[in-house]
Regions:
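Substrate-recognition/cap helix-loop segment adjacent to the acidic, metal-dependent catalytic center
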Residues: 70-85, 89
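Active-site-facing substrate-recognition patch
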Residues: 1-57, 67, 97-133, 167
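Short beta-strand-loop/turn "lid" adjacent to the catalytic site in phosphate-handling enzymes
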Residues: 57-73
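PRPP-dependent phosphoribosyltransferase catalytic core
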Residues: 4, 12-17, 150-179
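Hydrophobic Val/Ile/Leu positions in short beta-strands of Rossmann-like dinucleotide-binding domains
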Residues: 60, 138-139
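Hydrophobic anchor at the start of a short beta-strand
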Residues: 56, 91, 136, 158-161
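A phosphate-binding catalytic loop at a beta-strand-loop-alpha-helix junction
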Residues: 139-152
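A conserved beta-strand->alpha-helix junction
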Residues: 88-100
Length: 179
């Protein structure tokens, strides 16, 4: 699974955080809620948009309860900053996946010292929206194990992850070309 991340998500367990690392954590939590200031969404979106080019699809990842509001808002902010191609097509937001039943949030699981949820236990499914052939990115605030993004890819059949922060201890960051 290819995952693009604007920032690395550091944990205080590895020592004191710098001001930049603290701000990354604050922004990552902030963009989980639509009630957060637009400037937080825009800050994250600018950095995420710099990792991709249009034309592309931005598919919001449903949260643990199936709500896509926060990630849809983030995706719309990203779309505003993605450069369009010669035909004027940039990034377009499409709700192409949904959660068939709630799952325990990764944040809650982490607090209980539980491991990640396996991709097949995320209960993500593709809806009937037709996507034309172009780069497709699953939009989320943070990735830990990558299993949610992998579940989205399995549900849709293709796509790469686009996150604000990557909390994995080891993962290669790269620009993705799917076609």
């Amino acid at each position: 699974m290819n995952i693009l991340a604007a920032r690395k998500y550091q944990t205080p367990r590895n020592g004191p955080l710098t001001l930049e690392q603290t701000e990354t954590r604050r922004l990552a939590y902030s963009i989980k809620s639509t009630a957060s200031p637009s400037i937080d969404f825009d800050t994250a979106a600018r950095e995420m948009a710099a990792l991709i080019t249009g034309p592309c699809w931005l598919v919001p990842i449903p949260d643990s309860n199936g709500n896509t509001d926060a990630n849809t808002r983030l995706a719309h902010h990203i779309a505003r900053h993605v450069n369009a191609n010669a035909a004027g097509i940039g990034a377009q937001v499409v709700k192409a996946i949904y959660r068939t039943q709630p799952v325990q949030s990764q944040c809650a699981r982490h607090k209980l010292a539980l491991g990640p949820i396996a991709p097949e236990q995320h209960h993500l499914a593709r809806n009937r929206k037709v996507l034309t052939l172009r780069q497709t990115y699953f939009v989320d605030n943070v990735t830990t194990s990558g299993h949610t993004l992998e579940a989205a890819r399995l549900a849709l059949g293709f796509g790469a992850g686009l996150v604000f922060a990557d909390a994995a201890t080891r993962r290669t960051q790269m620009q993705v070309t799917l076609f």
